[in-house]
Amino acid sequence: MSVESFTPTALEFTPNAAHKVKTLVDEEGNDRLKLRVFVTGGGCSGFQYGFTFDEDVADDDTIVEREGVSLVVDPMSFQYLAGAEVDYQEGLEGSRFVIKNPNASTTCGCGSSFSI
């Protein structure tokens, strides 16, 4: 039996997303806040993305830092998000954080639900 090392594919945190997180953190006046991205069961395609601000980081969380702010992902969610890009977009449909996920085989029209 052999042991193989596993290096997870990075999660990309775009400058647009980092800038928006920084703006929101500054508005709250709490520099301990981090953007937590997670995956839960549900939505029209089986899984859905969620975003929240969190002060706490668990020992097994993945942390991605850019421009002085942090994005945090728990290990269960990371397996679905490895290689994905977290971005922030503004357009006619409004403004929101979006995930471009190469692991998703299908996504719903709103972009917040996916299947593998």
From Swiss-Prot:
The keyword Iron-sulfur applies. It comes from the Bacteria. Its cofactor is iron-sulfur cluster. Keywords: Iron, Iron-sulfur, Metal-binding. One of its GO terms (biological process) is iron-sulfur cluster assembly. Pfam families: Fe-S_biosyn (PF01521). Binds 1 iron-sulfur cluster per subunit. The keyword Metal-binding applies. Iron-sulfur cluster binds at C44, C108, C110. GO terms for cellular component: cytosol. SUPFAM superfamilies: HesB-like domain. GO terms for molecular function: 2 iron, 2 sulfur cluster binding; 4 iron, 4 sulfur cluster binding; iron ion binding. Belongs to the HesB/IscA family. Required for insertion of 4Fe-4S clusters for at least IspG. Homodimer. This is Iron-sulfur cluster insertion protein ErpA. It comes from Pseudomonas syringae pv. tomato (strain ATCC BAA-871 / DC3000). The gene is erpA.
